[in-house]
């Protein structure tokens, strides 16, 4: 997709101006389109330079950014390309005082909260920025009458939780055995977890790198066969009555749970899956220690997040292999590994 030229900075200096999304030079319009299409069913290029998100919400671009534009609009130094959001404004009024500091996007529009299609578009673009290392520029006057423009740059590492969608159901005892090398002991009781000792943590780290060798092809084949047999027996009768949750801990601040349920509802990105329209088994990995609000994580929290992230990735790989699953992150984007 060709650039539409240099972004006209003068169009974005006044209150009420359109919002912008900006990305580093290595991000291509095709990557942006792929994520847009995964979020919205009616998304796609309408014409050169016009990418529909949903309904009347569109992105115009890409535009080039030079140093003078970055300085004029106070954009991050890495910004090289930009898209303008064209969307009919839909607002509900000021953000309630007790809700401030909870959500990055809501705080940015505290003076007049977006709702409906505008909120959906902004939320989706913020998720795309998190995935691609970009930023959302919110125009002046959005958080307060005389407030300057704001730059929202979500931390790519903040996307921790994963879900695996599979045609096959794995029972509690089998999943505990499958995931023990990477998640440790999993319990039905959220209050019964013991903090792992230093030696236990060392053993778990070693197990992560040796998980395939430890389980072996025969064990994985057995779990796959059991899941397939259960699915054949149950057919399309999987319901939330089969749901269960398991709890575990990887250390201080690194408590988590694995929720397993059946559902016909899947993210838009899976709408073309061969199993679409039938019940999926959903294996949800969620970090319980995630801090609330927009504050910066301290060192202990960052270490805990890193532990959980690595363990979740290993667990999701195992589940995807054992149950022929598809991994989706908390922003509803596909996750793949080389």
Model regions and ranges:
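Acidic (Asp/Glu-rich) sequence patches and key acidic residues
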Residues: 1-338
């Amino acid at each position: 997709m060709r650039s539409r030229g240099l972004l006209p900075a003068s169009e974005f200096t006044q209150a009420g101006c359109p919002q912008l999304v900006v990305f580093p030079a290595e991000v291509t319009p095709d990557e942006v389109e792929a994520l847009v299409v995964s979020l919205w069913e009616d998304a796609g290029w309408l014409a050169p330079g016009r990418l529909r998100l949903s309904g009347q919400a569109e992105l115009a671009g890409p535009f080039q950014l030079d140093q003078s534009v970055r300085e004029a609009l106070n954009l991050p130094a890495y910004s090289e390309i930009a898209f303008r959001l064209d969307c009919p404004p839909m607002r509900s009024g000021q953000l309630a005082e007790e809700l401030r500091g909870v959500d990055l996007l809501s705080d940015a529009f505290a003076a007049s909260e977006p709702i409906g299609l505008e909120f959906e578009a902004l939320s989706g673009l913020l998720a795309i920025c998190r995935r691609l290392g970009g930023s959302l520029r919110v125009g002046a006057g959005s958080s307060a009458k005389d407030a300057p423009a704001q730059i929202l740059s979500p931390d790519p590492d903040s996307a921790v939780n994963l879900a695996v969608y599979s045609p096959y159901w794995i029972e509690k005892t089998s999943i505990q055995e499958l995931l023990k090398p990477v998640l440790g002991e999993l319990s039905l009781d959220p209050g019964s977890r013991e903090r792992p000792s230093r030696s236990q943590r060392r053993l778990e780290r070693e197990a992560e790198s040796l998980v395939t060798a430890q389980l072996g092809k025969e064990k994985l084949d057995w779990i796959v066969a059991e899941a397939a047999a259960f699915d054949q027996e149950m057919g399309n009768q999987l319901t939330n009555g089969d749901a269960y949750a398991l709890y575990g801990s990887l250390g201080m601040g690194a408590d988590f749970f694995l929720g397993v349920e059946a559902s016909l509802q899947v993210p838009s990105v899976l709408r073309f899956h061969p199993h679409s329209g039938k019940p999926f088994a959903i294996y949800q990995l969620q970090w319980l220690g995630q801090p609330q609000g927009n504050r910066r994580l301290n060192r202990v929290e960052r270490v805990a997040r890193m532990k959980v992230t690595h363990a979740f990735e290993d667990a999701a790989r195992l589940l995807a292999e054992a149950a022929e699953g598809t991994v989706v992150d908390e922003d509803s984007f596909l996750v793949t590994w080389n």
